[in-house]
């Protein structure tokens, strides 16, 4: 009896991570949400405000991507973010977009909008193949 209980618990431990993955329904919902974000973000402020949501979708999608896709987008995102370190330890969240502090200036607004458009394009390509 004891060995069957142990075997059952072991089987549950092996199966449970498979049940909590990024499902096809989640992927389809995120694909629709990306298209909606890109379509609805008509002005610069809307694009800047939607950047975080694009990053959140990318973070959900991250485990299901190929190594090449992850490295490509990570490199792009890291080029546009700064690590915030206090006493050598990253703050909660670990990174802050460079563009956030620069949004005030009109010249930097173009950089932020360009980041949104490029990130949106890269993530949308992941869904369309």
From Swiss-Prot:
Glycans are attached at residue 49. The keyword Secreted applies. GO terms for biological process: cellular response to heat; defense response to bacterium; innate immune response; response to bacterium; response to cold; response to heat; response to mechanical stimulus; response to oxidative stress. Residues 1-21 form the signal peptide. It holds the Pfam family Turandot. Disulfide bonds: none annotated. Keywords: Antibiotic, Antimicrobial, Glycoprotein, Immunity, Innate immunity, Secreted, Signal. InterPro entries: Turandot. GO terms for cellular component: extracellular space. It is found in: Secreted. A humoral factor that plays a role in stress tolerance; gives increased resistance to the lethal effects of bacterial challenge and stress. Regulated by the JAK/STAT pathway and NF-KB-like Relish pathway in the fat body, upd3 in the hemocytes and Mekk1 in response to septic injury and consequent immune response. Belongs to the Turandot family. This is Protein Turandot A2. The lineage of its organism: Eukaryota, Metazoa, Ecdysozoa, Arthropoda, Hexapoda. The gene is TotA2.
